[in-house]
């Protein structure tokens, strides 16, 4: 600028679009230079006829496109100069502000300042602070700092103050300040308090903080403003140009032509003006440093660039622009890349001429790209300064629209836009990444829905076809879905994890249509499961060692997610036989997808391994395979099951989908499948390839006893395959029964299965749970009964070994998933009324022995799958599945050493708590709780679905109840004492970990403490069973005597218990469980009639085990009583609690075997405690903490 013209003072303080903001400007007043800075008050006259008013400078900026130097000020008038005039309400020092800020060009503002203001006599005349005193005591810097921070919005005004000091501004005779009314009051109050002190005290930090104002001018005038008014004639002033108001609010409108700006700003002037100061303050810091350089360049550039096209609008410029556009369009058309539509940049259509001119001034494309100055071009175009991709977008548009022409003009070779290529590479890389992610997600979603549909319609369209070909193929598909090679166990795990991630995206789709997905998955899975059952079902010799590694994998917290699912899948597989397992597997995959947050590890395999060291390992592996394969396998049983209860299956199947995805790769190769499980358990989703290989080799080295490759992904089936589960349960229960008979019993048809399991399972499971699993894998009817107890034993044994690790994982999962999933389908039975449960038990028992045995077991499997689904996710927390763990642990009763291998979750309907009686059980309980919580959504759906199933069908009426009632009655009879022991154990366990195991507690289970409680209860039950070595909830003798008898007795006991418990506040629970399990805890009639009749006096209860469990073994997971048990007053009653502990202590704290104790605890507690919620007092006493 010219020496005597307007000049900006100081560095720019902000940049916003085409605006560059400044802190001060200098002009000449009466031949002397004067500086006005932001926040300054000065006298002005808008016109020579207008009264004197005070202007507060709030914003200074330059519009680069038009080279306008603009200001925004707030005007204050004396009351007498306002239309209303002064009245008695106005103070002598009061001024009234104009409601709208005025936008004035600096040249006009300077004219306003040129006037005689000597007549102004208003305002409070404050004593000035003597600068000499300030200089002596060094308070001047403090004052300047205060003014800078308080009065200048924190902007750095040092340069401006220095300029002012050089000009002697501080000693200006006329200085006026307008305060807010509160500030004015505080100031006057402070002056009154220090009236006898020297004025320099106003510079004290405390005086300033209390409202003091240190004015260094000779004649400071203090006024205040507390009101505004609308000035009638201000708008008519020619100097005011609101059309130039900076658009700093709302959606950025970019730089618009003046006429447009007038239109757009005319109505927004006030709001824009009001925000000018603050907006500038915000923008100032943002652009202060960046603007200093760009500003100068941009000012020059834009002045030259845009002055021609816009400001200087000369014919020459217009002609140049027109000629450029004609030549550009012609050239681009000739090179067969015509410019059809000019894109928008920052909500404004690009001006090609402006862009070209700006680029040329900066040196052209190559120079701008090398210097990374595309943001400058963007600013030239008036783009949104807040855009984070402005530079890239500008460069891409330039490359596409102008770069070819620029090269043509310069005589350069018309390359295929080499610079554009990098840009395209960035774009394409990002786009590819996005596409890859999206496509991967879509692919997974695609595959899962496809699998669902295929499974529904035909077991092998794509995924189904692959699955039908082999479980391994299905695993491959899952692996491909997970985008990880299936050969390595680590790869499998990674793939599964990726699948989870992709499924996490897919969950949007699959969760939206979980039932559908699960249904289809189960449909195709059922057939594929049948194939797998044929392939692997008959081959119980799956590597038990590999399964054990899987269990370790399940123990891994990171891997706990899949393991949780896997155990439930394992349970389902066992219950539904291999077909059922595979059926659930597909759903497991979708569930995995739906819950991608959970690590795609495969602890469930570990659970299963624990369940049967020999067979359970195979079972875990089989379940892992099934978990993956079920998605692609579709057996007719699964098909039916899907048709019967697709919704329930969907929820669990989603959880299982995750597990299945995890286990799918394992299915491909038993060794591989197991390796992922091992990997999951051993590692929280992160495993070195070597470790994975080792696990894989271990898994493959030890043949899984049951061919189920994690074969039962019950969670998958539980939602969509609830019905299929019933059907599959009938078929699978036999094959699955051996491996996961307990698990199956825990399924929705758990009542029937529980009865059967309890009758034939106690001794069988205790003796050879692994053998039974193998046997029942082959034979489905028996497996229905034994499936639960055995499967529970497997989880129990598994949980015993993995309890601590699993519990850690479970605790984490519980915390993570307790909130996300507030419903646990596995506890649906808890929601059923006792009377209904009784009828259901009878119905289920009847059906179990008849055709319903296959259907409802399928349902049980579904429920288990639900339960497992939840547990599997929790197992990511180190607790695969409480229910499956319970079964595994019970199995461990017979093979306590082997049990550690099994860590797969059992059905949610199954008593998951029994799995957690030991420290390991505790871990499993946590795992179950976590997975259950994570699967809470799915399971909640399952709950509804099961509830529907349960009510319509006696067997189904208590999907949870089935597991609970059947197993519970047996469990009760099996563990009259053990029940108390289990209760005690449960309390101990609850202190350790309380996964959600109660059917009725399903929603709460999803919560943190409650869900864990139930899991603990179930774990304790399982532990108690393990101790007593009784696989089924009934007496070992009773169980041995006959599953049928146990089933009938269970039904009767359930009915009786239900009858008693119905009145006792456990209507919605499986009363048979409570009463048989806790004779001492409950009222004499209830406990004695229900429990004593079923359980031998010396029968060890899982609760008993629980009591000792936490104390005895860190592996033992806390036993979680079903809400029924809780409501029964087991825990609420001090006497009962004493009895419980007595029972626990007396009835073999450890029991004859951990497996027996686990088994007992699993069935009775799981069955007895279907209630969703324990009384708070009971919960607190039974479950002191959610975690170990």
UniProtKB/Swiss-Prot annotation:
Polar residues bias locations: 597-609
What are this entry's molecular-function GO terms?
A: DNA binding; transcription cis-regulatory region binding; transcription coactivator activity
Cellular compartments per GO CC: nucleoplasm; nucleus
Is the Phosphoprotein keyword given for this protein?
A: yes
Q: Where is the crosslink of kind Glycyl lysine isopeptide (Lys-Gly) (interchain with G-Cter in SUMO2)?
A: 130, 445, 494, 496, 767, 774, 803, 810, 893, 916, 920, 935, 988, 1000, 1013, 1055, 1070
* PROSITE patterns tied to this protein: ARID
Query: Could you tell me the Gene Ontology terms of the biological process aspect for this record?
Result: adipose tissue development; adrenal gland development; cell development; cellular response to leukemia inhibitory factor; face morphogenesis; fat cell differentiation; fat pad development; female gonad development
InterPro entries documented for this protein: ARID/SWI1_ChromRemod (IPR051232), ARID5B_ARID/BRIGHT_DNA-bd (IPR030408), ARID_dom (IPR001606), ARID_dom_sf (IPR036431)
Entry-annotated residues carrying N6,N6-dimethyllysine: 336
Q: Look up what happens after changing residue 336 to A/R.
A: Abolishes methylation and FSK-dependent DNA-binding of the PHF2-ARID5B complex to promoters
Q: Which domain of life is it from?
A: Eukaryota
Quote the PTM field.
Answer: Methylation at Lys-336 prevents DNA-binding. Demethylation by PHF2 promotes recruitment of the PHF2-ARID5B complex to promoters.
Compartments it resides in: Nucleus
Tissues expressed in: Widely expressed, including in liver (at protein level).
Q: Where is the signal peptide?
A: none
Q: What is its main location?
A: nucleus
The answer to whether the entry has keyword Methyltransferase is no
Instruction: Enumerate the Gene3D superfamilies for this protein.
Output: ARID DNA-binding domain
Query: In what ranges is there compositional bias, type Basic and acidic residues?
Result: 446-458, 847-866, 1036-1055
What is the similarity comment for this entry? Belongs to the ARID5B family.
Q: What function does the entry list?
A: Transcription coactivator that binds to the 5'-AATA[CT]-3' core sequence and plays a key role in adipogenesis and liver development. Acts by forming a complex with phosphorylated PHF2, which mediates demethylation at Lys-336, leading to target the PHF2-ARID5B complex to target promoters, where PHF2 mediates demethylation of dimethylated 'Lys-9' of histone H3 (H3K9me2), followed by transcription activation of target genes. The PHF2-ARID5B complex acts as a coactivator of HNF4A in liver.
Q: What is the protein name stated in its UniProt record?
A: AT-rich interactive domain-containing protein 5B
* Gene that specifies this protein: ARID5B
């Amino acid at each position: 600028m010219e020496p005597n013209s307007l000049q900006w003072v100081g560095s720019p303080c902000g940049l916003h679009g085409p605006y560059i903001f400044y802190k001060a400007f200098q002009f000449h007043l009466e031949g002397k230079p004067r500086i006005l800075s932001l926040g300054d008050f000065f006298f002005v006259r808008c016109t020579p006829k207008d009264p004197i008013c005070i202007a507060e400078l709030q914003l200074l900026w330059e519009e680069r496109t038009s080279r306008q130097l603009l200001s925004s000020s707030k005007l204050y008038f004396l009351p007498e100069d306002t239309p209303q005039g002064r009245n008695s309400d106005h103070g002598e020092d009061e001024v009234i502000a104009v409601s709208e800020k005025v936008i004035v060009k600096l040249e006009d503002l300077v004219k306003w300042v040129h006037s005689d203001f000597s007549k102004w006599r208003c305002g409070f005349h404050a004593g000035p602070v003597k600068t000499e005193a300030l200089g002596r005591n060094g308070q001047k810097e403090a004052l300047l700092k205060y003014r800078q921070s308080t009065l200048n919005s924190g902007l750095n005004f040092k340069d401006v103050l220095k300029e002012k000091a050089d000009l002697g501004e501080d000693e200006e005779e006329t200085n006026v300040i307008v305060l807010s009314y509160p500030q004015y009051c505080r100031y006057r109050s402070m002056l009154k308090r220090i009236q006898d002190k020297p004025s320099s005290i106003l510079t004290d930090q405390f005086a300033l903080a209390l409202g003091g104002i240190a004015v260094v001018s000779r004649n400071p005038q203090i006024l205040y403003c507390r009101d505004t008014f609308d000035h009638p004639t201000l708008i008519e002033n020619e100097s005011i140009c609101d059309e130039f108001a900076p658009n700093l609010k709302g959606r950025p409108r970019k730089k618009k032509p003046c006429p447009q700006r007038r239109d757009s700003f005319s109505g927004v002037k006030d709001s824009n003006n009001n925000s000018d100061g603050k907006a500038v303050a915000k923008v100032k810091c943002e652009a202060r440093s960046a603007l200093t350089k760009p500003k100068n360049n941009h000012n020059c550039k834009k002045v030259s660039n845009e002055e021609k096209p816009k400001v200087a609008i000369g014919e020459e410029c217009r002609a140049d622009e027109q000629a450029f556009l004609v030549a550009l369009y012609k050239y681009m058309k000739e090179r067969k890349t015509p410019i059809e539509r000019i894109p928008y940049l920052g909500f404004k259509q690009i001006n090609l001429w402006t862009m070209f001119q700006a680029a040329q001034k900066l040196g052209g494309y190559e120079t701008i790209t090398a210097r990374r100055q595309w943001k400058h071009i963007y600013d030239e175009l008036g783009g949104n300064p807040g855009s984070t991709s402005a530079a890239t977008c500008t460069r891409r548009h330039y490359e596409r629209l102008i770069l070819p022409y620029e090269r043509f003009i310069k005589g350069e070779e018309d390359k295929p836009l080499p610079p554009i290529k990098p840009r395209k590479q960035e774009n394409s890389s990002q786009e590819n990444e996005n596409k890859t992610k999206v496509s991967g997600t879509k692919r997974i979603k695609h595959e899962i829905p496809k699998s669902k549909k295929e499974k529904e319609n035909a077991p092998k369209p794509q995924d189904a076809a692959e699955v039908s070909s082999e479980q391994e193929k299905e695993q491959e598909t899952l692996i491909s879905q997970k985008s990880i090679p299936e050969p390595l166990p680590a790869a499998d795990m990674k793939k599964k994890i990726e699948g989870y991630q992709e499924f996490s995206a897919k969950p949007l789709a699959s969760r939206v249509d979980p039932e559908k997905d699960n249904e289809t998955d189960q449909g195709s899975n059922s057939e594929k499961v049948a194939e797998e059952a044929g392939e692997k079902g008959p081959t119980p010799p799956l590597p038990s060692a590999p399964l054990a590694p899987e269990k370790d994998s399940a123990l891994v917290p990171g891997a706990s997610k899949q393991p949780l699912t896997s155990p439930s899948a394992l349970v389902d597989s066992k219950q539904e036989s291999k077909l059922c397992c595979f059926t659930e597997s597909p759903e497991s995959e979708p569930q995995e997808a739906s819950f991608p947050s959970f690590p795609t590890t495969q602890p469930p395999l570990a659970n299963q391994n624990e369940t049967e060291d020999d067979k359970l390992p195979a079972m875990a592996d089989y379940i892992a395979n099934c978990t993956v394969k079920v998605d692609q396998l579709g057996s007719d049983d699964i098909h039916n099951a899907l048709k019967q209860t697709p919704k329930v299956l969907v929820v669990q199947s989603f959880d299982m989908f995750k597990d299945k995805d995890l286990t799918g790769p394992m299915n491909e190769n038993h060794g591989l499948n197991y390796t992922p499980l091992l990997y999951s358990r051993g590692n929280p989703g992160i495993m070195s390839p070597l470790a994975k290989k080792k696990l894989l080799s271990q898994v493959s080295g030890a043949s899984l006893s049951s061919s189920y490759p994690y074969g039962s992904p019950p969670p998958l089936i539980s939602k969509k395959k609830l019905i299929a589960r019933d059907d599959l349960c009938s078929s699978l229960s036999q094959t699955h029964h051996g491996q996961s008979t307990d698990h199956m019993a825990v399924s929705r048809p758990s009542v029937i299965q529980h009865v059967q399991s309890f009758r034939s399972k106690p001794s069988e499971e205790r003796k050879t749970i692994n053998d039974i699993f193998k046997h029942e894998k082959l034979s489905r009817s028996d497996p229905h009964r034994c499936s639960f107890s055995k499967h529970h034993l497997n989880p129990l044994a598994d949980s015993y070994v993995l309890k601590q690790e699993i519990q850690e994982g479970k605790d984490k999962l519980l915390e993570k998933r307790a909130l996300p999933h507030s419903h646990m389908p596995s506890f649906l039975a808890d929601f059923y009324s006792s009377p209904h449960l009784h009828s259901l038990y009878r119905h289920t028992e009847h059906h179990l022995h008849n055709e319903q045995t296959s259907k409802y077991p399928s349902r049980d499997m579904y429920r288990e799958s639900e339960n497992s689904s939840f547990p599997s996710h929790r197992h990511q927390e180190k607790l695969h599945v409480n229910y499956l763990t319970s079964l595994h642990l019970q199995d461990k009763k017979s093979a306590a050493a082997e049990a550690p291998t099994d860590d797969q979750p059992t059905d949610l309907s199954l008593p998951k708590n029994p799995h957690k009686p030991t420290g390991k059980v505790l871990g499993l309980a946590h795992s179950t709780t976590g997975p259950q919580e994570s699967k809470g959504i799915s399971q909640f759906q399952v709950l509804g679905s099961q509830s529907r199933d349960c009510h319509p069908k006696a067997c189904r009426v208590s999907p949870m109840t089935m597991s609970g009632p059947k197993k519970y009655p047996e469990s009760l009879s099996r563990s009259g004492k053990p029940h108390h022991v289990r209760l005690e154990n449960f309390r101990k366990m609850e202190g350790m970990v309380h996964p959600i195991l109660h059917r009725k507690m399903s929603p709460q289970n999803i919560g943190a403490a409650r869900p864990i409680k139930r899991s603990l209860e179930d774990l304790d039950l399982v532990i108690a069973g393990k101790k007593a070595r009784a696989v089924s909830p009934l007496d070992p003798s009773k169980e041995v005597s006959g599953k049928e008898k146990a089933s009938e007795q269970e039904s009767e006991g359930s009915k009786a218990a239900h009858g008693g418990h119905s009145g006792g506040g456990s209507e919605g629970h499986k009363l048979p469980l409570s009463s048989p399990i806790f004779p001492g805890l409950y009222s004499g009639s209830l406990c004695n009639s229900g429990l004593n009749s079923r359980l031998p006096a010396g029968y060890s209860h899982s609760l008993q085990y629980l009591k000792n469990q936490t104390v005895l073994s860190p592996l033992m997971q806390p036993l979680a009583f079903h809400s029924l048990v809780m409501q029964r007053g087991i825990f609420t009653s001090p006497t009962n609690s004493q009895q419980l502990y007595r029972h626990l202590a007396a009835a073999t704290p450890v029991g004859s075997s951990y497996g027996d104790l686990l088994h007992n605890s699993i069935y009775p507690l799981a069955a007895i405690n279907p209630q969703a919620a324990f009384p708070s007092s009971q919960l607190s006493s039974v479950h002191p903490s959610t975690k170990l």
